[in-house]
């Protein structure tokens, strides 16, 4: 694992399909990819296996509705190391998406979120065993994620997302 420094703010821009079109130097450094390898690659090139598909399903649903989305994310650098971020993703007026990421400042909340993700990954594994396709697994994972968030006392993902915004 390598740490994102408190002063490091980084971004990427993608097209409507999630293919990276722009990235800043901090993103390049943390991901340990060359800029040329990132541009034109799907953003999930940095997806860590500890991230449930349900989290991304929820994100894409929000984005397709024109809403921004915020969440804690575990990313996988090219060298196999992990780096954790708080990501805010928003639709851009002319198409595509902007993802701005920073160091998770609320470590206790981050740890709870990652426990929820762990439970969601287990849930998704069971759904996958039932021969569900990738989209069905992600949709079920998203529903499971929302159930756990409601059990934690939040009425919706939007309420939860607002509560975990870094202050």
How would you name each of these model-derived features?
Residues 1-122:
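Sensory/regulatory domains in signal-transduction proteins
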Residues 94-166:
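Sensory coupling linkers of modular signal transduction proteins
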């Amino acid at each position: 694992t390598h740490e994102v420094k408190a002063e490091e703010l980084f971004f990427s821009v993608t097209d409507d399909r999630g293919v990276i079109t722009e990235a800043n130097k901090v993103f390049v450094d943390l991901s340990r990819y060359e800029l040329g390898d990132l541009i034109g690659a799907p953003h999930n090139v940095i997806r860590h296996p500890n991230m449930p598909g349900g989290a991304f399903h929820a994100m894409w649903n929000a984005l397709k509705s024109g809403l921004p989305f915020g969440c804690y994310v575990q990313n996988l650098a090219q060298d196999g190391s992990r780096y954790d971020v708080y990501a805010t993703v928003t639709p851009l007026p002319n198409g595509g998406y902007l993802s701005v990421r920073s160091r998770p400042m609320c470590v206790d909340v981050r740890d709870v979120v990652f426990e929820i993700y762990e439970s969601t990954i287990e849930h998704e594994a069971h759904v996958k065993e039932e021969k569900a396709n990738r989209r069905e697994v992600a949709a079920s994972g998203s529903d499971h994620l929302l159930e756990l968030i409601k059990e934690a006392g939040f009425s919706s993902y939007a309420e939860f997302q607002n509560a975990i915004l870094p202050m």
